[in-house]
Regions:
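Acidic, Mg2+-coordinating catalytic module of metal-dependent nucleases/exonucleases
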Residues: 84-96, 129, 133-196
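Short alpha-helix plus adjacent loop in nuclease-associated cores
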Residues: 111-131
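Conserved non-catalytic scaffold segment of RNase H-like nuclease domains
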Residues: 1-107, 130-144, 148
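P-loop/Walker A phosphate-binding loop and immediately adjacent motor/lid segment at beta-alpha junctions
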Residues: 105-109, 179-181
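Short intrinsically disordered terminal tails
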Residues: 1, 196-197
């Protein structure tokens, strides 16, 4: 088992893993090396206008791409080497992959940068009684991510790089929280991830 983690992202024809299909799958390691990146040709859908407006992946772009069945063993070879999976709304991507035959380790830990970022950004959602989940573009902008360095937003490889950047910032940037202990003001240095726990 490697003592590292992977960042994964997908682009899909819609939001329902049982009905919609993968259009792109990207996986990078914690150092930014590309482990897998491919467009995926759907086998049931021939158009996805609503999703295309968001991810800009047209039917023509995936027409000559492999199907998920043709690449799932390559994806599984990667997944079985990592016990930590990072993503932005990671369960969405993991569910789509699992529905298509992906085999994550039973012991895999999932780190969701979206859920970690929500209390840092601090926008409260009264209806849910919790912090509002923010878009990846919001989280990346908050930390000053330069999209031009890699792909654009809503391309799964570009989203992997942005997620890696945000996840790293959440876990390495520190803030000084001041507390009064025994009558003395003391500064405690914590990462945002430590503060949100």
């Amino acid at each position: 088992m490697e003592n590292k983690y992977i960042v994964l992202d997908t682009e899909t024809t819609g939001l329902n893993a049982a009905e919609d299909e993968l259009l792109q799958v990207s996986i990078i390691d914690n150092e930014g090396a590309v482990l897998f990146d491919s467009y995926i040709k759907p086998t049931q859908h021939t158009e996805w206008a609503e999703a295309e407006r968001i991810n800009h992946i047209s039917p023509e772009m995936v027409a000559d791409s492999p199907t998920i069945e043709e690449v799932i063993s390559e994806i599984n070879d990667i997944l079985k080497r990592y016990d930590k999976i990072v993503g932005y709304n990671v369960r969405f991507d993991a569910d789509f992959l699992k529905h298509n035959g992906a085999e994550f380790l039973n012991t895999a830990e999932y780190a969701d940068a979206m859920k970690m970022f929500a209390p840092i950004y601090g926008e409260w959602n009264d209806q849910r009684g919790s912090y509002k989940w923010q878009k990846l573009t919001t989280a990346a902008g908050y930390y000053g991510y330069d999209w031009s360095a890699h792909e654009e937003a809503h391309n799964s490889l570009g989203d992997c790089y942005a997620t890696l950047f945000v996840y790293d910032k959440i876990n390495t940037d520190t803030m000084v929280i001041e507390r009064v202990i025994d009558g003395k003001r003391v500064g405690i240095e914590l990462t945002p991830a430590e503060i949100s726990q």
